[in-house]
Amino acid sequence: MLHIENYIRPRNHWNTISHGEDINRLNLLLSKFGLKVDDVIDAPTFTTYISNLDVDTKIKSVLRLEDNFGIAVKDNNVRIYLDGDKLCIEKRGADNEVAICDLYKGLSDSKLNLMIGIDNKGKKIICNLAKAPHILVAGMTGSGKSVFLHSCILSLLIAHPRDCEIYGIDPKGNEFLQYAPLNNFNFVKDTVYAIQTLKHLVDEMEMRYSTLALARCRDIDEYNKTHSMKRIVCIIDELADLMYTGGKQVEEYIVRLAQKARACGIHLIIATQSPRADVLTGLIKCNIPTRMALTVTNNTESRIILDQKGADKLNGKGDMLFLPVGRTKPIRIQGCYMSDTERQNIIGVALARQDPNFA
């Protein structure tokens, strides 16, 4: 575990917004159904107004007023949803930054944790990739998709500077280049070589299963109690480029890894700014249930990445909907942001800690 306290910015004081006018306007609408604003929750960039529902409340009639609620709180992208017996009206709030200093203490050298962000209730969200065990990510230019991928890489570098091998597949060649000097980072730019890398990971997976069988171990966690096997995380910055080149072959490799690689410690984080059906195919989606949706261009793309609407109404800059495995409703989160200086500082600390003979 890297000690990065001296290399990251301290937390800034978070601003809040005034709620009085919003509450008055919302109460005028809610009073028609015998409801009112009962609570307000401020998160870094969201404000949620909560109304306690009665058993006889006409829920469908209330939900139809989404546009009216948007006018009331002066936010065209207002989000209305149910949380148990509560009606939640969520709008853009104060413009506060979620930084590494807010989240990095949730990392652990015993878990494959990723810094995600802070949700709309103010809770810090950390994802254990070992349980995910793979993630699909979608977001248009300016959504914060690349920042999210950097956050994943830095999470792994901070918690596992030596015992996690990372493959960064970056067809455009400019997103992951700064990590290339790291001994445990395999920078892959060429699309053809990227497809070969996926095949290599499939072969590595099969070899690892043979190793586990010989040791009579069920999975990598059991094996590592008496032996040593590094975890591998493959991060693909743009799946569309690979699908256009490799098509069915790429899909086959990804599906095989998604189906089997978890137990032997290989994990995928696959991103695209083109969440179309020919990129995120049905086979890929059904084998990778954990999803991260940043802002997408339309309702159709939202349904492809999340199987539901909503991602087309996000605000960009790290505003995201996170759908962990096992959940049917996504969590709205403001993602973790790190400056270029912080990123370079952490890379420098990781380089200093690495064994020169790391392989």
State the predicted function of each range.
Residues 220-221, 359:
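Conserved C-terminal helix/linker of AAA+ ATPases
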Residues 15-18:
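Accessory nucleic-acid engagement/destabilization modules that flank
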Residues 349-359:
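C-terminal regions of RecA-like/P-loop NTPase motor modules
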Residues 1-13, 25-64, 68-72, 79-90, ...:
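P-loop NTPase catalytic phosphate-binding loop
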